Amino acid sequence: MPWAGYARPIAPVLTAFAETAVVYDRFYSISSYTAMSIGGLLAGRYPSELDRSGHYFAHWGDVLFFPEMLRRAGVRTASAQSHFYFDQRSGFRPAFDVYEVVPGIEEDHQTVHGITSPAQLELGLKMLSDPATVKGRFFAWLHFLDPHDKYEAHAGIGPYGHTTRDLYDGEVTFTDQHVGKLLDFVAAQPWGARTVVIVSADHGEAFGEHQCFRHGFELWDVLTHVPFMIRAPGLAPRRIDTPRSAVDMAPTILDLFGLPKDPAMEGESLVPEMRGAAAPARDVVLDLPRTTNSDRRRALIRGDFKLVAIGDDDAFQLYDLRNDPGEEHDVQWTARAKLDEMKAAYRALSAKMPAVCPSSREKLRGKKSHRPC
């Protein structure tokens, strides 16, 4: 994105927003696949830990999501979505007082058809115009999906070019315009000045890096390094370079409402460091459970190094992100001490993060007969 050094000015609204916000320069999604990332974000846990279906990654009622905790504390919760997964299948609906999906969404498990930002904006503005939603404390989650394959050209934007990356950039600009209209609406409301606004994403996108396209099958930084910006009353704009993860989002939002996190949550509140406290170093964990589409991947980020575990820890890769941000050179053979340190830390962490088997027994690709998940 432009505020992170991308040369093409594809998101002027969010670039201006970054000047008024606390910006995390090394923020990671929990996974590289929407259902896993969002489930983990809402639960404050890793997707491997959550009871779920093995194919659609539907979450069952015993998974506690932080919006449900807000509801119990008297906070009104609302969500507007623009993909068929977020309808009945995801299991997120019961955590919200108001939960709506853009009508007419086509169900396709390979790609996304159509343009939804205008309808998503309309749905979000309707929710935020309802006095029942905004008369007291409220939490609203609006998920814009248009920067997503299938990439569409948009009239009046660019032209940036005709490659898939060019089309994707145009989709970012198109969505940025609609997010801008949403932010303008919020700013004009009587409650706007006392409202916290958070901007983030559930995964990145690959355009040929590591011979990968789209997302959801690996844990490269191009798939997991995402924006995280927060603007709040009394919060001075600043940049934070310490690695952090979306697993911290649930404890952070609960803290902003004055509520403690659930004991099962893995993340920590970022509120103290947002307010100026030092940001202590913490490991970041990425988790891509085995599914019907791909084998398991996990990764551990500690400082400038990233350890990737493949399958049931059958193989490892080690990258120096400061000197090799594109993760092109595996340094495990030349940095043996660092490899041993990272593997020990990873195994200790994995021992505390057991994998819950999917409740639906679809055959999982790469599943070994002696391994339940």
Identify the meaning behind each predicted range.
Residues 1-373:
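Catalytic domains that recognize anionic headgroups
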